[in-house]
């Protein structure tokens, strides 16, 4: 002990901590040459530390089961898609164990404490999986369902009915390997050739689509949930697909996707009619959540399908709309993520595929949400605010990198067999950092004290979002992973973080009215009771939502259904043509009576029979009965002011408020960035090893007898940068010092056919 004390001058008031003594003992043993004794002592210390921490990692099995069965824990309603059931109990039990495993065995103390203390919220701790994923429907059509040793394998579907069954099974299987939404892109485009090949009647098509919709709404997922499914529908044949051979039964047909417009319309009509009809009691289908592409060539005329689409929008609020008119997105983005080249590690990419969906072969490995109101409350000034947010972003980014490393190891070890078979890697998946309560952060900030309806708060929020974007670029350089900034949907996070904050800081400002259940406003949304003028809200949100790279959506909350389909179409068009935000919905409230079916608006009792009715509204992003919502979201619904479309007035917008026309997939340039050396004609085909369409592009050139040079884009960055190549396949034509760039296989095929 003398040796130890002689080495340690940190004794104060004749007291010394146990940790200081043990540190000194370790040091003395090592310096004295007692290596074996030192090793044993270190192991002993670690064992004692685990015993001391045992109480924090032990779970009380009785409390876990009782809290669910007796509904004493608010987390029973944490997710409104999980109904009270034995499946929900099993999910609750396993989730508690898995969350404990993440926090005590995988994440370090700093990460674990930040979550437990509600500085951040790590989503989906109850799952040892990634968050969300988009899948290639084309791959399923080409390869069939299976390929896993010891499991049943189905050959590529040759008929629409078989494909619909395979899609239901595929989504159900994948949902068990992921925590969140599963998505297919170009649903109508890829299904249309099956209709054409078998010359199906409309009734036959509708029966197939009905089987798909009912199938994905069956609670087959863990926790007695239906698979959380999202589909994007093109409505018109996309440019990057229209010239490609259609695929049925795993084989190329003698017609292209562009030849299937009539059949595509049949698929869309069948889907919408089924969604409008609802189930046997008139209840709207929860899944799949459809996202429709609003492009410049969208046909707004009074077609039968347009009437159906906007009737579904007016009545149930089912669809999401992707704004390809004024946003910085392109329709082909949902299919090109795995082909995009990472020219700049600091470039923040958009996560495509809709609000909950993901583009093909992309998605998110995990989400961490930062508690913005608490940061503002604890900060004396802006400088402190940014220091605190940087620290929490560092913790969040590190936690996501750890999660990516862990689930990648588990993927390679076979824990997610179907994900390994159809995806193979998480390289194209994002690490997602989100935020909540920016409105309340501005109210708590001592240097603002105003909500987001004021210009000072809006300007500060823009600065914060841009600061976070820069920080994410730093993490991409540091870790080599994709990072994105999300407007977190925050179904349960909004309540959990506010509940913690009120308990620790009674005078903190939350979104709730005095004496109401605490909650925070999602991301940088406006106060839910601010205005009934939708365009007033859009004018503010358009400046903020465009700074996010995923998860952002504007919900047009309505008190009841719109009077007719024309009113819905006019509103959807007006938003797309005058605003830049990428995703939006029309979201009416409606009710369901078991005897009389659909009722417009919020009606807790049926006006016809007096029976109790279910009131449905959109929670974060999907429709669920309000009775299933957690207390925080229920409080938000009570305070929500719905928009009055009749009294809403659009303000004049300056030309600079909207973006310029997007660059075409085929472009010609002669500037420095695209200049060619010499004047001899050359043709380059840029490809990557993971690109699914590069072979098709090469085949088109060879069929037309066009000579070309293959450039491996991953190994020739100098040429990639010289010619401004952003994705594979890309064809570069050098003619007389001019450079023409053709991106995607469809444009390359069209060029080759013109040369024949």
Language model regions located:
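Structural micro-motif
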Residues: 723-732
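Thiol-based oxidoreductase modules, predominantly thioredoxin-like and allied folds used
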Residues: 706-718
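Conserved phosphate/anionic-ligand binding catalytic regions in large, soluble enzymes, centered on
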Residues: 178, 182, 226, 425-442, ...
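Charged, amphipathic alpha-helical regulatory modules used
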Residues: 1-63, 425
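Conserved catalytic cores of very large enzyme subunits
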Residues: 47-51, 57-427, 448, 454-608, ...
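Local sequence-structure signature of Cys/Sec-based thiol-disulfide redox active-site neighborhoods
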Residues: 670-704
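Non-catalytic, surface beta->alpha helical segment in thiol-disulfide oxidoreductase systems
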Residues: 735-756
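Long insertion/accessory domains within large nucleic-acid-processing enzymes
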Residues: 604-657
